[in-house]
Amino acid sequence: SPNIVLILSDDQAWTDYGFMGHEDIETPNLDRLASRSRVFRRGYVASPLCRPSLASMVTGLFPFDHGVTGNDVDGRNNREKLDIPVQEQFHQHPSFIKDLVKNGYLAHQSGKWWEGSHFDGGFTHGMKLNGRHGSGESLSIGRKGIESIKSFVDLSLNDEKPFFIWYAPFLPHTPYNPPERLLEKYRKPG
């Protein structure tokens, strides 16, 4: 079984990569990975919002079928409490992640994940236990390193099991705080 790494960037156009033909943006590591991977060049979203789109990708259902139709539930207070029935309904649906695990994969969640704990989502390992977009370590993935992913890959190799990695860094979402070396590279004179 092949290992699978799903990379989901936040608020980034499909054209913003070297391997997709951007003339200015350089993405050498992603270009190298793309050259030996399957790249989906014609992807479409089920919703213009993050959360329902991710839920549709996981379940294969439209938002009105899986019940996640917005990023936030209505209500000024107690949003987390009001969101519990939405998450419970979501977890009743099929999921490609649960299918991978049933077929012997180890599955790791890192970065953005809206639907409760990674265990609820069918992942065997993960970073996020709660929160709207993730919290702490989950949102710092990519900005501060990928140690949890490296450890997970080592574990999978030691266990001789195929792996699935959900790598959904909050990048390039705000705050825009690139390393100075990259900022200088793209800064225009004057």
Model-derived segments and their meaning:
Residues 1-190:
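Formylglycine-dependent sulfatase
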